[in-house]
Amino acid sequence: ESDMKRTTHIGLLLAALCLAHPAHSGGQREEAMSANVRSSLQRALADTAVTRTAFRNTADEAAWLKEMSRRLAKRMPDESERMEFLTTLHWEASRAGVDPQLMLGLIQVESGFRKYAVSPVGARGYTQVMPFWVKAIGNADHNPFQLRTNLRYGALILRHYIDIERGDLYRAL
């Protein structure tokens, strides 16, 4: 339970930090990527389908899913869709080493939890994946409107930027 409270506090702190500063989205742009980075990101995309969250403790998993489901109920009225979204988000964020609460905040800002959101510059889906990422690390079969694909790309891209910015979340976001 203390892990759940700590995770919730971290998520709220990060959300407050993001809201305290005006958004300065510099926009993603295609940049040269080393073969090693490209290969690493491609391998990360090639994993198996999500079947559960990354929690090791089922009580923590149930508590997190219940609380996050309650918070998202107005934005995602269909409970089965909401649970699939949360399960996939938790797995993909954890897999990429990104706090799931941070991913939820990113999605709220980027797409308002709209699966088919498209930005004026062509970013797509929940995490607003830019088309050049699919070309750079994916393949033509990857659909950024597909839930698992979008959350996986979003988590990996966020992890990539966090690494580039040496853990500075403000700059990475």
Question: What is each PLM-predicted segment?
Answer:
Residues 48-173:
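Catalytic glycan-binding domains that act on GlcNAc-containing polysaccharides
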Residues 1-70, 75-80:
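N-terminal secretory targeting signals
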